[in-house]
């Protein structure tokens, strides 16, 4: 039974990621109503005007307005992009203490409005902050989603598509684990235009080194972009829009998001990037890909990395 009826999104955090996400929603007419909240109310005012001026060219009418936490009471989806930004040379996990404090305040304000929808978390370190949102909100695990490795998987598919000269949508390959340095590719189930990657590499052995380099490029892409222009935002904004679309269209789409594991992949009590079925009620279920021994070992290491960080976080004790 689908609980939610409308398509109202409240966006908290109107920085580079948040404003790019807002534009993606309006451009694609994914929502009926978009409310934007940020401490910088003047920037929100300007962005709301700018987005409204774009709506005559969007496929359908989208209502856009500046708001406050009380607007969350009837929202279907609250998307959190607020938090301290990642600095050059700083890992996503370095951000944890600063952003946990911010999230405790944000989630408390949202829940005080009697919010009863779905949370979508984008702020880094996203796996830990999705877990924190679940803990702070008291909502069922199905209704707290992190953006996880949706962007990493997109980068991975793009680079593989370029290597094999096919469209990215013809590549089925996932990055799982932490959205960060311990993420891993699921080579054992990757396929290009329906052909197993393993089979293709047997036909062109020289491609093995290229494939390994593709993962390195995928993993380190954010650092390269941050070094070049200070932040990444277009890719993750489109990923967030894709998750939003899957929710509101009740798609049962499989996307690599950060979800709570309760025995899947032999892990417990951790939010981490895995394939999951997304529909109007949030996460329907986690999809367990049979990993080979090496992949399982790397995934366990990734989960342990996140758990070790959370164990040190005073805000989660």
Swiss-Prot record:
NAD(+) binds at residues 17, 38, 43, 69, 83-84, 105, 122-124, 147. GO terms for biological process: glycolytic process; lactate metabolic process. Its main location: cytoplasm. Substrate binds at residues 86, 92, 124-127, 152-155, 232. Gene3D superfamilies: Lactate dehydrogenase/glycoside hydrolase, family 4, C-terminal, NAD(P)-binding Rossmann-like Domain. GO terms for molecular function: L-lactate dehydrogenase activity. The active site is at 179 (proton acceptor). SUPFAM superfamilies: LDH C-terminal domain-like, NAD(P)-binding Rossmann-fold domains. It catalyses: (S)-lactate + NAD(+) = pyruvate + NADH + H(+). Its EC number is 1.1.1.27. Pathway: Fermentation; pyruvate fermentation to lactate; (S)-lactate from pyruvate: step 1/1. GO terms for cellular component: cytoplasm. It is found in: Cytoplasm. Keywords: Cytoplasm, NAD, Oxidoreductase, Phosphoprotein, Stress response. The modification Phosphotyrosine is found at residue 223. Homotetramer. Belongs to the LDH/MDH superfamily. LDH family. Catalyzes the conversion of lactate to pyruvate (Potential). Appears to be the primary factor that allows S.aureus growth during nitrosative stress in both aerobically and anaerobically cultured cells. This is L-lactate dehydrogenase 1. It comes from Staphylococcus aureus (strain JH9). The gene is ldh1.
């Amino acid at each position: 039974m689908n609980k939610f009826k409308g398509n109202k999104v409240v966006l908290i955090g109107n920085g580079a990621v948040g404003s790019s996400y807002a534009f993606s929603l309006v451009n694609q007419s994914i929502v009926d109503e978009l409310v934007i909240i940020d401490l910088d109310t003047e920037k929100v005012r300007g962005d709301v005007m700018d987005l409204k001026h774009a709506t005559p060219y969007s496929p359908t009418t989208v209502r856009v307005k500046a708001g406050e936490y009380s607007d969350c009471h009837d929202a279907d989806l609250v998307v959190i992009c607020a938090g301290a930004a990642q600095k050059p040379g700083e890992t996503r996990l370095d951000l944890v203490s600063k952003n946990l404090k911010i999230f405790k305040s944000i989630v408390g304000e949202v829940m005080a409005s009697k919010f009863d929808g779905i949370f979508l978390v984008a702020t880094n370190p996203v796996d830990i902050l999705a877990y924190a949102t679940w803990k702070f909100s008291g909502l069922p695990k199905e209704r707290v989603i992190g953006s996880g490795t949706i962007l990493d998987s997109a980068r991975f598919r793009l680079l593989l598509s370029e290597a094999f000269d096919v469209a990215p949508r013809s590549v089925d390959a996932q990055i799982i684990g932490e959205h960060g340095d311990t993420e891993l590719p699921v080579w054992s189930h990757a396929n290009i235009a329906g052909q197993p990657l393993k089979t293709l590499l047997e036909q062109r052995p020289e491609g093995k080194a290229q494939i390994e380099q593709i993962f390195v490029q995928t993993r380190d892409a954010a650092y390269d972009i941050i070094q070049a222009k200070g932040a990444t935002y277009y890719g993750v904004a489109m990923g967030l829009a894709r998750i939003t679309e899957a929710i509101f269209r009740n798609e049962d789409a499989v996307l690599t998001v950060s979800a709570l594991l309760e025995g899947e992949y032999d892990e417990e009590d951790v939010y981490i990037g895995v394939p999951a079925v997304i529909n109007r009620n949030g996460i329907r279920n986690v999809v367990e890909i049979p990993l080979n021994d090496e992949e399982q070992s790397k995934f366990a290491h990734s989960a342990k990395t996140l758990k070790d960080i959370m164990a040190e976080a005073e805000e989660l004790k």
